[in-house]
Amino acid sequence: MPSFDVVSELDWHEVTNAVDQANREITTRYDFKGVKAHYEIKDKKSVVMEAEAEPQLRQMSDILNQKLVGRGIDLKSLEKEDVVKGNMRASQAVKMKEGLETDEAKKIVKMIKDSKAKVQAQIQGDQLRVTGKKRDDLQQVMALLRGADLAQPVQFTNFRD
């Protein structure tokens, strides 16, 4: 039976490239002259922005978003945390969401069932397996999910015929 997996993954190589580009940009920008500010990737789970003041963090956030979008990373996979101030510095972590959360997976399963497509969807950890008798049914579900407004970006992998 044909099947495919619905996953939410990040291309960490592209995230690293975007962070490097953003670091390069803040070293050359006029409004960041003489300011100690930088981005850093922590444990392939988040990007930490550090600057001297909170308004600079907002500018850094805009720069990072621009670079991530330019690299094809969906901003829905970002989750900004609160700004931490102290010791004449301000920092903010931006979590990168990977893997379908259970609530989101349940929402997708319900959406697939409501579409009356002749497929079965089952949650397998942090991904979703969709199986059906016909390839056309699976492609119909893919189109449905692409057009849906989901909280996380989704990709389709492991398409088997």
Curated annotation (Swiss-Prot):
GO molecular function terms noted in the UniProt entry: nucleotide binding
Cysteines paired by S-S bonds: none
Gene Ontology cellular component annotations, sorted alphabetically: cytosol
A Pfam family this chain is assigned to: DUF520
Record keyword Nuclease present: no
Keyword line: Nucleotide-binding
Cell division in keyword set: no
Signal peptide: none
Superkingdom in the source lineage: Bacteria
Physiological role: Nucleotide-binding protein.
Family that this chain belongs to: Belongs to the YajQ family.
HAMAP family for the chain: YajQ
Name of protein: Nucleotide-binding protein Mmwyl1_2033
Originating organism: Marinomonas sp. (strain MWYL1)
